[in-house]
Amino acid sequence: MNKLSLFVYLFFFLSFLFLFLYLLQPFFNPIVWAIVFGIVLYPLYGFIKRKLKSENLAAFLVIFIVLVAIVIPFTIFAVITAQQIIVFSIKVVNFVQTHSVNDLINSLKEIPFLKEKRESLEPLLNYLQSEEFRRALINALNSILTFVGDRLRSYVYTAGTSLFHVFVFLLTLFFILRDGEKVLKEIINSIPMKREDLEEILKTIYRTVLAVIYGTVGTAVAQSIMGFIGYSLAGVEFALIWALITFFAAFVPPFGAAFVWVPMDIYLFTTKGIKEGLILLFFGTFLISTMDNIVRPLVMKQGIKLPYVALFFSTIGGLIKFGFIGVFLGPIILSTMLASVKIYRRRVIHSGI
């Protein structure tokens, strides 16, 4: 093939590949989630397929398990959380309408911890009682409540789209389980790269997905459950919302769930009492944060080893650029890049190829 023919071929191939990916762009999230779940659930699919001797039936049963064990419970949890957010918002509005800023400042002055520091905090307390702060507070509360209301309305309006994305996710997962091995072989045979190098990259992606799933997500779920129990026993209102916040905070290094429970514990000690503060301190120190120090290393030690700073930026960058799915995409991109650098050093620098 001469250079002109090669150029024409590559031009048409890359052009239509770009158009195809552009068509898939609206379904990016459900497709990526389907790939992630396909990687994790493929051993289960293989086990069921060997028992039933049917690819279609095995894939359908895995989809049914995902629907019953993950999709439906998550939907119920989302509805309950939305209800608690609405109740919380109503309580905030009622509190603002029935209490003045001066009432709030006077109640703060009665907190034992602040009584001792009253003289040094007097300028701050005077500012908090000023008309300037009152206007700023009202504007901030209006902005927050408007944002919450807009988000809830958008979720209601896009319920149909969300259901369609769930359908796309389940449909894609079905075909990934049933035909994924065949498609993967075709991709491997079509990429002009040494087979062992390509397999190393694919194994890196596989190990990264499993490490993130079992390590990070598993730890976050365990921490949010322990957090919900601790918040409930300590008398924290809207414990389910705080447990949900704890779940997402668990993905943020370096402190994870401690970003939530430590400030909450300080609040309990200074406002509720020593008993409530000690309850959450026990749960936070010995149960919530211990999950991060024990569960995650045990699960991820057989997976990937990434530089901590690089992992921090890849996770945060993934969250910012791709949303929650970025928790997976960030480390995958990082680990694949490092694997590619390793291959480059082995093939090009050391071998001179």
From Swiss-Prot:
GO terms for CC? Answer: plasma membrane
Can the keyword Glycosyltransferase be found in this entry's annotation?
Answer: no
Keywords assigned: Cell membrane, Membrane, Transmembrane, Transmembrane helix, Transport
Main location class: membrane
Organism listed in the record? Aquifex aeolicus (strain VF5)
Per its UniProt record, what InterPro entries does this chain match?
Answer: AI-2E-like
| Cellular localization per UniProt | Cell membrane
Name listed for the protein in its UniProt record: Putative transport protein aq_740
Q: Which residues form a coiled coil?
A: none
Instruction: Look up and give the membrane topology term.
Output: Multi-pass membrane protein
